[in-house]
């Protein structure tokens, strides 16, 4: 998990289709750091490249890479139980990741076995969306504490703003 350079976020409820953009902004802006709280260069990987999308639309774009590719990644699958078909589809995809198909005789059809984190919402309400946002914000800040970085400054972003002002 800690060595993975990317984090895949796939949601299986169309109403959450933009959640990956929120997660990208929160995590990458907060934890994209190379200097720790003691002003020392870190000697380990911090942050992660966040990517993903809406599951039913994503299956033919990047799921091949997930199942048979060579890159390791953290995988999060999010769905509400209220969307029954998509919930079953998500469950099947996670099951396929965990169990694989090592008994397949044709080696080129075999898939990698890997884990995934399933975030299951009872329904999609303002309360449950708030819980999901809070979960992601807490995950982000705890990673920052673990890496000893400051999640609340974004000097890389600020430099771009300063240089834009100079151009005006």
Q: What is the meaning of each model-derived region?
A:
Residues 1-168:
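A SIS-like phosphosugar-recognition module
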């Amino acid at each position: 998990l800690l060595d993975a350079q990317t984090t895949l976020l796939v949601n299986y409820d169309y109403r959450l289709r933009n959640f990956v953009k929120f997660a990208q902004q929160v995590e990458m802006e907060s934890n994209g750091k190379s200097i720790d709280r003691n002003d020392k260069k870190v000697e380990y990987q911090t942050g992660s490249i966040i990517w993903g999308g809406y599951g039913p639309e994503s299956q033919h774009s990047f799921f091949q890479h997930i199942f048979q590719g060579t890159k390791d990644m953290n995988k999060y699958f999010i769905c509400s139980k209220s969307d029954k078909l998509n919930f079953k589809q998500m469950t099947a995809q996670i099951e396929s990741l965990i169990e694989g198909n090592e008994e397949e005789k044709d080696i080129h059809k075999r898939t990698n076995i890997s884990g995934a984190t399933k975030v299951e919402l009872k329904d999609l309400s303002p309360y449950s969306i708030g819980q999901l946002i809070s979960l992601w914000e807490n995950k982000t800040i705890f990673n920052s504490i673990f890496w000893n970085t400051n999640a609340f400054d974004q000097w890389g972003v600020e430099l771009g703003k300063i240089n834009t002002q100079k151009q005006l």
